[in-house]
UniProtKB/Swiss-Prot annotation:
This is RecBCD enzyme subunit RecC. It comes from Buchnera aphidicola subsp. Acyrthosiphon pisum (strain APS). The gene is recC. The keyword Transmembrane does not apply. The keyword DNA repair applies. In the RecBCD complex, RecB has a slow 3'-5' helicase, an exonuclease activity and loads RecA onto ssDNA, RecD has a fast 5'-3' helicase activity, while RecC stimulates the ATPase and processivity of the RecB helicase and contributes to recognition of the Chi site.
Length: 1070
């Protein structure tokens, strides 16, 4: 008997199943109740459901539809040892074997085409698997060369390819049993009534799922005369919607005013997916259909939509009223992924705080692109203080430890293709078990980062490896050349010398010799595996690869033991599966790597954790009712686009009802989520482009939901509004735009900011309070260096020196590529040294050799070009400096300015004033530094012009000042310094840029005309925001923490600070 229980509630259907089990118990107490579904999460839910009813859940057996069908094949065909040898892997290798034969595809015979062969074989294996399940009659007819002419000539190569696979399988005496011919055999046995009923299960329950295809349904229908089959069919539609949907049309041209159900694309999409059940199950008069629908009593928008699906009333188009207080459906437009999770967190807090009936376990968050959100989820949900923590669980396919082991395995397997970039190699030491294997401590790993930067190790093991990668054969920037430098440095005892064309480093001493040895050992093992993995080998050779790899790289312990076993088991399964195809040629590890990771992640290992907010993929919800369902990442990229490789897929050319369709599946999952949400359905997506903040459209499914609501609902009094006007009002109400700085404007989670600052800054003292810090600022002695450093960047100095807060030293970022260009920091250092050598008439040839061997200059003519260009530029500056540099006087100072004592050193005092020089352009910080020194020089009686010479002979100078005036100015800057310790002073580069535009030197005033103001503000904003080539001042971490928003209030403060402190500098320009 085939009985269909049809309902819009999973709990109703499970209750029916429970009553059947209770009312008709098996005579054999050991016989298990069988449930068939394609996701273990539902089985987990079923066990909890039954346990709540009965007090215990036992004697249940869960089957995936594929597994159960093969179990039936074994029973009905009396083949206990029956195996499905036509696996995806087996078909791949069979096709590769065929492609190796020149007779089949002439253009795929070369060895260098191995990866192309694999990709083609992988694609065709996937397509053939679909043919076997969805067109078994094709496969059976092809094998007996029947009805081939119905296919176009340019499609018949697929038939020949399949025939070749079957021929090769029989050739090596392997079974040619696959689903298609077993399906045919079972149909024959059922027709002949030769089934032995006693071996079949007495009854089983099937839950409607994506894995149900027409062939499976036909088998179940045919055996229902021998056993009781209960089909639990979950659908929001009480009546059959298919009478209202045109065949083979998902979307129709919507005529807004036409009252037709076809306008409801959401309903159409769901209906298209459910056609399989209507045509293969519900239409059959042999089957018994029992409706068990429940109407939603709630009057919310969400409940009314579900009732529309349930009732006949949705066809009349009588609009229902939408309450302004109704928040059961919300659509949130966010700035980026982090912001999207921040907004979600705040919303979940509201759900939990305002609804005592909602617990964390009543909430599920789904996304089609969950992997891309994991880091943001962990960051936001783990950063909040304990009082506001929401327990959560991310349903990943592997444990965290297994994910790390898989990452390491993938990295090592990729060594054959690797350039051995420094960061890529050092990342392996971030895995504790690998670091432990080679005996590296955390401190030693930090030292390695420093060594690699100093020795300019970039990529490549040695010159041979570079040659293998088809690059010029030289040892510059390679690992072993860098190690030579380290060994020479150790031998030279902390001195910097050139020996045999190698420059030693001055930072190595004898105490670090052991660390050099560890590094050599680590690189040698990596080199061994690079060579091993670069060679083609037989499949049998690769079988033991994982155990060998673990032995060489990992310190075995109980923490990773289980993960090692999981991965090793899967690796051996993949190899054994491949060996069953009897492929006898050598193969690249790259192909096995692709197969392994595809197969590993293709399996569904997801679980739910009770009592917490679960993050998962939409298909894991499995009709399970939740009070709150949130869908994140629903932008226009969340639905898969057309796969152009499907041009090979004949199912697309000759479609039938029940064919798998990814687009329909994603659409169905979206509407299923809406249907399973009991109280709230929350949607969010990123609505702004990362590039230029332009508008990004949501998924078409979100648009269709809005369209459906617009067609069926309106606010009170809006009954006569046009579709367009009604759409505007509803969209404005349901869609909320969230700003980038969401958290700074949210009172409920202020603690996040504090945690954020703690994460971003390193406190050098514990339990620091602002009051205590300010009390310490009573010392009247001021070092000139401190005064200058403060005025160069007041906000940074405020954090560093008085709050004792500094940016946390993140893991050192090292350059990964060889230096064709000199990085800005090295360029600055080289130019300064070069200018110093030219001014002091030192040997610049030796300096060039030093920088070339150190690796800081690019190799060969790249370095020569840089050096020659900068010699010319530095000579121009040096000539200008030498023009003014007559004396080299240096003076210690100790000045009393009222109650303050200033001490320090003034250097390069000339008879004409102070002289300073630099290799780059003169900035506002250089001006203010020279200005403060010039004030002290003037107080001491100096009467010359102080000047600074910069790039391209640029000169900034200050005119002579009398002592009294200089004293007054300096006192003001000292007072500003003291005040700047108590609260941040908004003196910035942006403010200086603004002032340069508005200050009138001739009249010593601020220009207030409209044109000048606009130009000045544009310059300020440009300096603050930057562009694609120049980093804006807003990226400065200290400013970012102080000036969180560039609003009118903050811009005014920036301009006022610039006006007060920088006008004296412009006014006294010489």
């Amino acid at each position: 008997m085939f009985t269909i229980y049809k309902s819009n509630s999973l709990n109703t259907l499970l209750l029916k199943a429970y009553h059947i089990i209770e009312e008709k118990p098996f005579s054999n107490i050991f016989e298990k109740e069988i449930f068939i579904y394609d996701n273990k999460v539902l089985f987990q839910y079923l066990n909890i459901f039954i346990a709540e009813k009965k007090g215990i859940s036992a004697n249940f057996k869960f089957y995936h539809p594929n597994d159960f069908i093969w179990k039936l094949f074994k029973i009905i065909l009396s083949k206990k040892e029956l195996k499905n040898i036509f696996t995806h892997s087996m078909i791949i290798w069979e096709i590769i074997k065929i492609l190796d034969n020149k007779k089949f595809f002439e253009n795929c015979s070369k060895k260098k085409d191995m990866i192309k062969k694999f990709k083609f074989s992988f694609l065709m294996a996937s397509i053939f698997k679909k043919y076997i399940l969805y067109r078994p009659e094709w496969i059976n007819q092809w094998e007996i060369e029947k009805n081939i002419s119905i296919f176009d000539k340019n499609e018949q190569w697929q038939i020949k390819l399949w025939m070749e696979i079957i021929h090769n399988t029989k050739k090596i005496n392997q079974s040619s049993d696959h689903f298609a011919n077993l399906f045919y055999n079972i149909q024959k046995i059922i027709k002949e009534k030769k089934i032995k009923k006693k071996y079949l299960p007495k009854r089983f329950f099937i839950i409607s799922s994506f894995s149900m295809n027409p062939s499976y349904i036909k088998i179940f229908q045919n055996i229902s005369i021998y056993t009781d089959i209960y089909f639990l069919y979950i659908t929001p539609f009480k009546k059959n919607i298919f009478n209202f949907i045109q065949d083979n049309k998902i979307f129709t041209d919507i005529k807004i005013e036409k009252k037709n159900i076809l306008n409801d694309s959401l309903i159409t999409l769901w209906g298209q997916y459910e056609e399989i059940y209507y045509f293969y199950i519900l239409k059959s008069k042999k089957n018994k259909v029992i409706n068990c629908f429940k109407k939603n009593k709630n009057k919310s928008l969400l409940s009314q939509i579900k009732n529309n699906f349930f009732n006949d009333s949705e066809f009349t188009r009588k609009k229902r009223f939408l309450e302004i207080s109704d928040h059961s459906i919300s659509i949130n437009i966010c700035f980026n992924k982090k912001n999207e999770i921040e907004v979600l967190y705040e919303k979940l807090l509201i759900f939990l705080n305002e609804n005592s009936s909602i617990k964390p376990g009543d909430i599920v968050v789904t996304s089609f692109s969950l992997d891309t959100y994991i880091s943001s989820i962990n960051l936001i949900f783990q950063s909040i203080d304990n009082k506001k923590t929401i327990p959560f669980f991310i349903a990943k396919k592997s444990s965290k430890t297994t994910e790390i082991m898989l990452w390491s395995f993938k990295k090592i397997l990729n060594l054959s293709n690797s350039r051995f970039e420094n960061e890529e190699i050092l990342e392996l030491l971030d895995v504790p078990e690998i670091a432990e294997k080679f005996n590296f401590s955390e401190e030693e790993i930090k030292i390695l980062y420093h060594w690699i930067e100093e020795t300019n190790i970039r990529w490549g093991i040695n010159e041979k490896h570079k040659n293998y990668l088809l690059f010029p054969k030289n040892k510059q920037n390679t690992w072993f050349y860098g190690i030579e430098k380290l060994l020479l440095s150790y031998a030279m005892n902390d001195t910097e010398k050139i020996w045999n064309g190698v420059l030693s480093c001055s930072f190595i001493n004898g105490s670090r010799s052991e660390l050099i040895g560890k590094l050599i050992s680590f690189i040698k093992i990596l080199e061994k595996w690079q060579k091993k993995l670069s060679k083609l080998q037989y499949l049998t050779y690769w079988r033991s690869l994982y155990s060998d790899l673990v032995s060489d790289f990992f310190q075995n312990n109980t923490k990773i033991e289980k993960s090692i076993q999981i991965i090793q088991k899967k690796w051996i399964e993949i190899i054994d599966d491949s060996l069953s195809s009897n492929y006898l040629k050598k193969i690249s590890i790259n192909i096995l790597k692709k197969i392994f990771f595809y197969k590993y992640y293709d399996n569904n290992h997801e679980i739910f954790l009770p009592g917490v907010v679960n993050f998962c993929y939409p298909d894991s919800v499995c009709y399970i009712p939740f009070k709150v369902i949130c869908m994140i990442g629903t932008d226009h990229t969340s639905i898969p686009k057309t796969n152009y490789l499907d041009n090979f897929n004949l199912l697309k050319k000759y479609p039938l009802i029940g064919d798998i369709n990814l687009y329909q599946k994603y659409s169905y999952l979206f509407v299923q989520s809406l249907s399973c949400a009991e109280k709230y359905f929350y949607i969010s997506y990123i609505g702004y482009s990362v590039k230029d903040e332009s508008k990004v459209h949501p998924s078409i499914l979100v648009d269709q939901l809005l369209n459906y609501i617009t067609l069926n609902f309106c606010f009170i009094g809006d009954q006569n509004l046009s579709y367009k006007e009604n759409s505007k009002k509803i969209t404005k109400y349901l869609c909320k735009k969230h700003k980038k700085q969401f958290f700074y404007e949210t009172k409920n989670i202020e603690s996040f900011i504090q945690d954020d600052i703690k994460n971003d800054f390193k406190h050098t003292e514990k339990n620091i309070s602002h009051k205590n810090l300010l009390k310490k600022n009573t010392d009247n002695e001021i070092n000139l260096k401190d005064l200058i450093n403060f005025w160069k960047h007041p906000i940074r100095y405020f954090y560093n020196s008085h709050l004792k807060i500094k940016i946390r030293q993140k893991k050192q970022k090292i350059n990964t590529t060889e230096t064709f260009l000199v990085n800005p920091l090295n360029s600055f250092k080289i130019k300064n040294k070069l200018l110093d050598y030219i001014i002091h008439n030192k040997n610049i040839t030796k300096l060039y050799q030093h920088y070339l061997l150190s690796g800081k200059l690019p190799y060969h003519f790249f370095g020569e070009i840089f050096w020659i260009k900068n010699i010319k530029e530095m000579k121009l500056i040096a000539n200008k400096v030498m023009q003014y540099r007559i004396e080299k006087e240096e003076k210690k100072i100790n000045l009393n300015i009222e109650k303050y004592q200033i001490y320090g050193v003034l250097s390069e005092i000339q008879s004409t004033g102070l002289l300073r020089w630099k290799t780059s352009s003169i900035r506002y910080s250089d001006r203010i530094a020279l200005w403060l020194e010039h004030l002290i020089y003037s107080i001491l009686g100096g009467c010359g012009k102080s000047k600074i010479i910069g790039y391209k002979s640029q000169i900034w100078s200050f005119s002579s000042l009398n002592s009294h005036r200089a004293h007054s100015y300096l006192l003001e800057y000292i007072k500003g310094y003291i005040k700047g310790m108590k609260e941040p002073l908004f003196l910035t580069k942006s403010g200086a840029s603004w002032l340069d535009q508005v200050y009138d030197e001739r009249n010593n005033c601020i220009k207030n005309d409209y044109y000048t103001k606009i130009k000045a503000y544009k310059k300020l904003l440009y300096t603050w925001k930057g562009d694609n080539y120049t980093e804006g001042e807003q990226e400065d971490y200290y400013l970012k923490k102080t000036i969180t928003i560039s609003n009118k209030k903050n811009i005014k403060k920036i301009c006022e600070s610039a006006e007060k402190w920088l006008i004296p500098i412009l006014k006294n320009k010489g």
